[in-house]
Each structure stands twice: as structure tokens, then as C-alpha cells.
């Protein structure tokens, strides 16, 4: 693991939300998993993307036209799009690999939209839509875009997307379109990676994701419980018990306390039976 990347990520995590540069933070997440990743190089590549786009537009172009122009640039001219063949490859969450391969998942592709939009002056923010990250263009009039396809979505389109992920009885709610903070975007990016690594039983990588989530939201009991579970899976039972005990001391969440108490009980050393 890249300790320099972790140290810089910790610095960014301590900043006010509006001061966080999402592209840099996302690249640092990737850098911790990949040796010798040159973060400034990829930030420069994003700047070059902006320069290429800027040469295609008129500064006086109405915002609506600029939005369509940017979508065409990202998804047609540059060829960015969703990795439909290997959706759950962790590489899809690493911004440097998305820049290199021009393939990713909704949230990593959203970072391309957000990065370019912020440079151009078009308000672009992430939308923590259930199961499928979206982006919103514009301040007063929201234009909802699926970063996986580059398609502008109507509210009925969003309702269909929701039902595809949550079932036919899912109801579209306005709260699903609330802008995501920068930290919320990073949390979701890390959560996606964590789920992939957890399913692969890649505990070192899972722990790295949890550690960074705790940098973004310190003392969050849910993540501390997950940390205890990682120690348990790694066979470090003393550290697992210690971590679970910390949650019992600090959390008022009865459900979480009950869950942790059961784990602690299961981890108690068994008395030897005399024969």
C-alpha cells in the first residue's frame, strides 16, 4: 500500500467539503492500490481533456447547448462509457484506469463529468441515486445525466431505472435527486470498492477502504464494526475483540450494540473440556 497516498488523502479528508478536489482524492484512492501511480500526471490529463473541449465551444454558447456539447465530447468524441463486459472489476473504480481505458462504472465516469464541468463553469454535481450514481447539470434547471451512457434522463426514465434496481414497486422520491457532497461521492466510491473486495475475501484491500472511510467520517461505528470483522476474517481475534469492544463503549445504536455483543460472545475463548 502507498503510504504517501494515504497521508495526502488524510489531509484532503480533513478539508472543508467545498475545498476537496474530487479528481485528486479519487486518484489517491487508486494510488494506494497501485504502486508508482503518478497523480499529477493524471490531473494533467484531465486538464488536457478540458483544453480539447474548450477549443470546440464558444464562451457565449447557452448553457443548455454547452451541456449537450460536453456530453457529446465525453461520450462520443472521447469515447468514455460504461464497462458492460466486466462491471465489477475494481479497475473500473480507479480514476487513472478510467482515463486510460475510457471505461468505468457510473460513479467513476461521473468524476469525468464533474471535473470537466467545474473547469468550464457549468455547475455539475453528483447525485447519490439508489444503486446507480447520476450527475446533475445546472443550478436552477436540473438536467439529470446517466454518466454510464451519457444519456439525459427524464423523471420517468429515472423511475424506470429505480425499478430496475429496487423492484417494480419502488417509488421515485425527490430526495433521490439531492446533490451529493464531495465526501459523499468519495464514500460511495470507496463503498463500491469495499463491496467488491469483500466478496473476493481480499481483506487487506477491504481494510484499506474502511480506513479511508474512517478518515472521511471519523468514529463512525458502522465502519469500526466492519474493521472488527476484517480482523476476525484475518484471524486476528484479539484485535477483533478490542475493536468490537470500542464500539460497545462508544455507540448508542442498540441494533449495532446487539450485533457486536453477539460477535464478542462468539469470539470468547472456549473453555477446555477435561476428559
Can you describe what each PLM-predicted range is?
Residues 1-275:
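A structural boundary/capping signal
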